[in-house]
C-alpha cells in the first residue's frame, strides 16, 4: 500500500513549517503503508536548511521499512535545487541530469 504526502507552497524556516514536518513524521510512524511518496509538484520553494529535516524523514521511513519516492517535476526549481546539491537523487521519480563539471 502507498501513501502520498503533499508538499505545497513555500517551505521557509518558520514554526508552521516545522509543525507540518512533525505532523508528516507522525503520519509516517503511524501508517501501515510500505511506500511513501513525497509529492513536490506544488512546492514552489524549499529552504536549504530543511534538507536535513527531509533527510531525517527519509531515514525514519527507511528504518520503518517504508520505501520513499520523491515525486518532483523534472525541471522544477525544487528538482533543480536538489539536483545541483546532489541530494536525494536515489529517491527521485526521474533520472536527474548529470553534472557537467563532475
Protein language model features and the residues they cover:
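Bergerat-fold GHKL ATPase/HATPase_c domain
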Residues: 1-35, 42-55, 59-102
